[in-house]
Amino acid sequence: MEQLLNITNEELPRETTAMARVFAAHVGKKSLSHQETMMRLTENLILARESGNSFITLEAEESAALLANPHFCRGEKALFHLEGSHLYLYREFHNEAALAEAIASKLQAPAPENAFSDAEIRAAFVKSGGPGTGKTTIIAALVTLEVKRNPGIVIEIAAPTGKAAELLTAGLAKACPEYPLKAETLHKLFKAQHGSGRFNCNGSNPLDCDLLIVDECSMISLDTAAKMFNGLKPGTRVVLSGDHRQLEAIGPGAVLDSLLTFDPGEREAARKLKKASTELTANYRSKLAPTIQELAKALREEDDVKLLTQRITNAASDHYCFKKSGKETHKEALESALSHWKKLPEVCAEITAGSRKQAFEMLKSFRIITASRVGQDGCIKFNEEIMKALDLDSPESPGSALLISQNCRRTALSNGDTGIVFTDSINGGVKVCFEHLEEPLSFHDLPPFESAFAMTVHKAQGSGFSEVFFPLPTKDTPLLTKELFYTALTRAAMKITISGTLEMVEAALMKKSCRSTALRKRILSQLEKADDEKKNL
């Protein structure tokens, strides 16, 4: 099937590859013309799914071809679901429909007694805002009010990745030290099964929680959001927080954006959703340097590509630098890396509390973030060059930085956690230290990992660094979007150097992410249905 679709096995996730093979077995029994039509639809759907879309839109003759074989697109055992001209994988359709019903149900729930604020009059509400707009402060205030009102309340706080959870925990510790709460990853909180991705907390075994607060929701895929809501008790209230202008989830769907993008012409039901949503715009306490703040604000609010390109390429300060890319790009990136990390191998010569703290501070002081993994401007290439420049022979060399790429409950490691390799002067050999773990780990205990000196913007999402070097690709790519550019810019707290051409900046700013999803439409339909039922009582 992979060969027929002109897609390599490596480009397909395991579940999609399996789906393609099952489908091939069915279409193999049909006529050649039918095979060609179905193969083309399958290829388009797989590629659309890999781009984050929940469905593809069919032409009339394509819909007719599917309807002529209803076992392909009707019923729970069908591979696909056809709704009008929209063709889904059945799983994506089910997730979208279930999530819409769950969110609408939360919005229809009665207000809690003695509500403190307008934000609390809904069982679920959404807030979005850029860095420094007060998202963590609002979460802290809500936690404080809820605990004072109901000391026995069970509150859970979560984020999609380990790094995002770690930063949220630290932020809440400062904002409300009297009520310390530890944020967990969604997969850990809902007890995800290793390998399958299923949550053990589900409709039959819901999470014991009265209030769930989830941060960095732009990173949550449709599949994860559906499983999360399915794993909640009917009375659990939900708060979703994030920045919907950042990159969307790697998987299909645009959950946060679907809840926050409003059309003035939308029907009455949209007002209920809008009332439950808040976009924070005022900047109260951003850790970002002024020039970075100003450019981030411009990216959020302006759509004039020419004007934005001029601002980005002409801005200059102690905190921001745009360099026209050339042969010196890699050399400049390596020079910056060495200025921050050249002593890292020396610091990692032994494991002490002081050396651990110093090593992680050094690592967080700088990062190279890239649009893609592969190619001359991909993170793999930069990592190879940095390892060589630091005289690190392998990932097991003291001073190497590792990025965990798979959740592992056994070791309490999550996708996105960063470790540093140290010499174990007591027992011999090397160990890997992680900030959130007291005891270092051996290499054989680690889940899959990669080098962490350079990472993709997707991997960096939810993290922050003092200084960032962001090399734009030399050729346009679908990955290069306005959302990716904005996310890269806001990873830097004190300084960012962007290396690229004016053409690549324009290419990024011209492409705004627009995923094919009907989640918002389904939520509004559910709300309208509930309103009609109330009127008929």
Locations of the language-model features?
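Conserved pre-motif I regulatory segment
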Residues: 119-128
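Residue-level signature of catalytic and energy-coupling elements of molecular machines
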Residues: 61, 99, 185, 215, ...
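Interdomain "pre-motor" coupling segment immediately N-terminal to P-loop NTPase/helicase cores
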Residues: 60-116
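ASCE P-loop NTPase helicase motor core
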Residues: 130-314
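Intrinsically disordered, low-complexity N-terminal extensions of AAA+/P-loop NTPases
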Residues: 1-62
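Conserved helicase motor core of P-loop NTPases
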Residues: 119, 245-402, 408-411
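C-terminal accessory regions
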Residues: 417-537
